[in-house]
């Protein structure tokens, strides 16, 4: 498992991480990640959801920097969809299957850091990170990451994509 300073060493900082699990196996995996992650974030909470998941998702989107869903991707997509704003505002959303084999960067791969968190968590679990952004697949620098690194702001993300 990565050392505690591994998160900061990768340029990742976390203000608030939330884990959401729907099953006992999901909760166990969430606990494993929590123990490995330990003191790497200033705040962390875990939520076990049996019902009313839709009601909980909206406040989680507003208050979390990183959301870890321990469930099927389809569940996470359906829960997140109504609250998605844009890539500059959404939290990093990752999906970890109950079996712990894959860590999927689902939302905010670049600016939210989900791609880097996926690699980091995958190391913890000896899992496969799943990254689908084109720049990462091509091993290219992403303009939004480059801008963030140098303290620059992109005024119009639509123009930046051209």
What residues fall within each predicted segment?
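Short, acidic/small-residue loops that bind anionic groups at enzyme active sites
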Residues: 84-109, 116-132
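Short glycine/serine/threonine-rich phosphate/pyrophosphate-binding segments
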Residues: 26-27, 75-79, 114
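Internal alpha/beta core interface subdomains
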Residues: 111-162
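Short, solvent-exposed amphipathic alpha-helical segments in soluble enzyme
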Residues: 32-39, 82-87, 111, 146-147
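Glycine-biased, low-complexity coil/linker segments
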Residues: 5-6
């Amino acid at each position: 498992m990565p050392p505690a300073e591994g998160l900061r060493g990768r340029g990742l900082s976390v203000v608030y991480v939330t884990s959401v699990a729907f099953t006992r196996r999901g909760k166990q995996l969430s606990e494993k990640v929590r123990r490995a992650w330990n003191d790497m974030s200033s705040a962390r909470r875990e939520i076990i959801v049996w019902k009313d998941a839709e009601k909980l998702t909206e406040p989680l989107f507003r208050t979390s920097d990183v959301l870890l869903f321990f469930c099927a991707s389809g569940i996470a997509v359906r829960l997140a969809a109504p609250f998605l704003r844009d890539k500059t505002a959404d939290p990093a959303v990752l999906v970890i299957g109950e079996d712990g084999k894959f860590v999927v960067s689902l939302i905010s791969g670049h600016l939210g850091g989900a791609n880097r968190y996926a690699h980091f968590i995958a190391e913890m679990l000896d899992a496969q990170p799943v990254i689908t952004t084109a720049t990462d697949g091509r091993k290219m620098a992403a303009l939004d990451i480059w801008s963030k690194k140098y303290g620059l702001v992109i005024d119009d993300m639509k123009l930046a994509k051209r």
